[in-house]
UniProtKB/Swiss-Prot annotation:
Pathway: Amino-acid biosynthesis; L-arginine biosynthesis; L-arginine from L-ornithine and carbamoyl phosphate: step 2/3
Subcellular location: Plastid, Chloroplast
Record organism: Pseudotsuga menziesii
Broad class of where this protein is predominantly found: plastid
Keywords: Amino-acid biosynthesis, Arginine biosynthesis, ATP-binding, Chloroplast, Ligase, Nucleotide-binding, Plastid
Protein name stated in the entry: Argininosuccinate synthase, chloroplastic
């Protein structure tokens, strides 16, 4: 999952919402 208010790392190690 991703939080539009913060930078979160996925289980794959990818960074979303840079």
């Amino acid at each position: 999952w991703f939080d539009p208010l913060r930078i979160t790392e996925t289980t794959t190690g990818s960074v979303t919402l840079k």
